[in-house]
């Protein structure tokens, strides 16, 4: 059963705990405190994995924009490729001078060893950058 969200809207949920990035931006560059806050933000993306429904597939060229005045960030996502493997890209920027870039791709391959003969491997690359030059992947 599908849930009433698109893939792109679901990606915006990764910023549910963006206040961790706001706090990390205020921490000293290359400090353990910043690393800890960025790691906590990375783990927070798993808060939505309990769902059993799948999101609606976005159409090629479809975009989704979310501006959260309460949390102080702007998020923009687009489906940039549909076949042979779907790719979504997203960018967000926050008031505390951080940026968040995401690219996700669902790699599909035929594999006799997998149940059903299809092997699905999601590949997600996330980059977080701060205005002082610190960057995390």
Model-derived regions: residue spans:
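Extended acidic, Ser/Thr- and Pro-enriched interaction/regulatory segments
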Residues: 1-137
């Amino acid at each position: 059963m599908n849930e009433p969200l698109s893939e792109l809207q679901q990606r915006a949920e990764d910023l549910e705990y963006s206040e961790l990035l706001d706090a990390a931006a205020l921490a000293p560059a290359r400090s353990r405190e910043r690393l800890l806050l960025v790691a906590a933000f990375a783990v927070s993306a798993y808060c939505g994995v309990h769902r059993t429904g799948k999101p609606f597939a976005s159409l090629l060229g479809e975009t989704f924009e979310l501006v959260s005045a309460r949390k102080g960030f702007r998020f923009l996502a687009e489906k940039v490729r549909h076949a042979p493997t779907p790719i979504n890209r997203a960018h967000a920027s926050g008031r505390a001078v951080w940026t968040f870039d995401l690219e996700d791709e669902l790699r599909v391959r035929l594999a006799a060893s997998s149940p059903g003969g299809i092997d699905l491997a999601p590949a997600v690359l996330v980059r977080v950058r701060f205005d002082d030059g610190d960057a995390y992947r």
